[in-house]
């Protein structure tokens, strides 16, 4: 596997290990690679996960428990290309469960406030269609959706 020198680093209040365990359960070829824990006398309880390193389909990610100093915003999101509606539905439902929140255009926040985009693979093809009217219809449809629905995007692009 290729060594990555640049990786996302996520700041959690105290739920990094729980979040990482959940995320790796959603994606194939994903795993927790290491967990370092706070020692006695640290800023968090001894034994609590300090930094959790994990891979999402080969992408290395680090997550740290460091208290309620910072919160996630939409300025950072994970974008996931989903090839089928079943995959979109599965990921969407799992990520908004237990306190997550849907947003517009395929965006959502998970229960920890981290933003995700669940995007059908065909969307880029529709948006880049040389028939600019077809592309505009697909874009207009997407702008009105919460969870993206492939059949509706294609129907809109086709003028149906």
Go through each PLM region and give its residues.
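Acidic/histidine-enriched, glycine/proline-rich intrinsically disordered or flexible terminal extensions
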Residues: 134-160
